Amino acid sequence: MDFSTHRLTTLLLLLLATVALGNAQSSQLTVDSHDITVLLNSNETFLVFANGLLDSDVEVALGTDSEDHLLLDPATFVYPAGSTRNQSVVITGLKAGNVKVVADSDDANKEIVKDVFVRVTVAKSRALIYTSIIFGWVYFVAWSVSFYPQIWSNYRRKSVEGLNFDFLALNIVGFTLYSMFNCGLYFIEDLQNEYEVRYPLGVNPVMLNDVVFSLHAMFATCITILQCFFYQRAQQRVSFIAYGILAIFAVVVVVSAGLAGGSVIHWLDFLYYCSYVKLTITIIKYVPQALMNYRRKSTSGWSIGNILLDFTGGTLSMLQMILNAHNYDDWVSIFGDPTKFGLGLFSVLFDVFFMLQHYVFYRHSRESSSSDLTTVTDVQNRTNESPPPSEVTTEKY
């Protein structure tokens, strides 16, 4: 073997050794599922395995952030070097609640076991779990459909009189920002990675149904706004107060985007600021419509179907939160961070107020405004029938 051949062989061996060492060092332990639900006094199993060959034995110690909620068997084990076997760990639910199971090891192997964690939910009843799922789907459908009674009413009347334009302006901005937040966290990997860095044991809060709902809500609101350009609207317009509020929101969004673009804050923070604007809009967006109904002493032109569906969705959403809090003994999710529950309650209270306006306060005005139940086509048909002048009705829009 000449010198050049010997040198080439040596280089190849060094390269193979480097690759093997790199693979060994990059190999980690992980689990087959990071989220598990177990019933009280029942068992569930998760598996620990290596995503490559380890170059040394790794001692793993499993711990929880709440010792009295569940039992782990085994709580400690050694994962052997070069093994591809699965290590089974049995979880026994002892007390309802949300528990995080995390792994620890010696300093040399902490990086290897960092992906060994499980979010465990100990539930009291499987029936309550299924009931919660049903509630979730029903309120998702109710909220999604709630946009269409107003669209249909506008189309049927060929008029948007009675529908407040400030409400529409706030709504389209709110749902646009909500869509940005959901799409960003669901589709953009850089934002997902940043979220994982900040909340290593957390789960992405945005799911596919959130993305679908927000985009659909934005689309339906755009349809309603387009109707305002083509149908009778009298002297209605967006108020200067609404323009001022929207200008403030625009400054917040633009400044936040500039800070994110200049790397002063992360783009994830920009999305959070957008979500805060959306929450603010949720609180105030119904006020202009309620005031308009009060000044007109009528709900004509404002679809009660929208309110009834929104009330159904909001009520079921709160019931689901209460149901889950009971099933998982997690009342802190409501009383410790009341934002979500409070916003749902606030919206439902507004729905109740609108129902009182429609069915109680301005009931006689609604009954006398029969034009809301008559389409332009009906008017044309009756005109074509050439009835006597005394039988011709006057339509109000």
From Swiss-Prot:
Keyword flag Acetylation = no
Which residue spans traverse the membrane?
Answer: 127-147, 168-188, 211-231, 240-260, 264-284, 303-323, 341-361
| Disordered: annotated segments | 373-397
Its recorded reaction(s) are:
L-cystine(out) + H(+)(out) = L-cystine(in) + H(+)(in)
Task: Report the glycosylation sites.
Answer: N43, N86
Which sequence ranges are listed under topological domain Lumenal? 25-126, 189-210, 261-263, 324-340
Q: Which residues lie in Polar residues bias regions?
A: 373-385
Residue ranges occupied by any PQ-loop domain in the UniProt entry: 132-187, 271-327
Q: What is this protein called?
A: Cystinosin
User: What gene name does this entry carry?
Assistant: Ctns
